[in-house]
């Protein structure tokens, strides 16, 4: 079985917020899940060690006219790109009619997504919680984890001279929109 999840929000933090839901899909169906994400999510750089992620597929869609998946031509290119993977199921983490139609055109049989046409002031995680609970009967602990290779962690400890006996502070600058507060 091959499963795709679409998370097309902009940044790293947006992608991280959805990891518990993607992991729940993987655990429910006992297969790693492929992700369709925007390049600026950097998912290909920080999720490449996650055992519940199969492939990272980049959505080439931006305000630049020459982006591969922009416009009506891009719509069909994306459908063609996804069709090659022969996905059985897709979880679309937004209310997009575009992605619903692309999934249909790609031949994906089982499509799960947020209710269509209900985007206004949509909270970032509540629809994901509802989607997973409704379709998988799974309660999610919204506590994202990123799997990292222990060697990378040890290299960072050495490089930045991190010591357990000292207070280490990490600032995570991110979204401030009310829809992104959890």
Spans of features found by a protein language model:
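Catalytic machinery of carbohydrate-active enzymes
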Residues: 1-182
């Amino acid at each position: 079985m091959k499963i795709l999840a679409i998370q097309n929000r902009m940044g790293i933090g947006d992608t991280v917020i959805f990891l518990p839901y993607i992991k729940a899909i993987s655990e429910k169906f006992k297969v790693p899940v492929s992700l369709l994400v925007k390049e600026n999510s950097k998912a290909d750089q920080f999720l490449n060690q996650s055992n519940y992620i199969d492939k990272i597929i980049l959505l080439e869609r931006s305000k630049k006219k020459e982006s591969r998946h922009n416009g009506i031509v891009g719509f069909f290119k994306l459908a063609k790109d996804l069709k090659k993977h022969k996905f059985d199921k897709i979880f679309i983490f937004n209310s997009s009619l575009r992605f619903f139609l692309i999934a249909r055109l790609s031949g994906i049989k089982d499509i799960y997504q947020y209710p269509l046409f209900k985007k206004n002031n949509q909270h970032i995680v509540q629809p994901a919680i509802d989607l997973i609970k409704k379709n998988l009967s799974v309660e999610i602990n919204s506590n994202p984890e990123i799997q990292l290779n222990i060697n990378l962690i040890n290299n960072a400890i050495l490089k930045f001279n991190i010591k357990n006996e000292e207070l280490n502070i990490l600032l995570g600058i991110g979204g401030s929109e009310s829809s992104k507060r959890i």
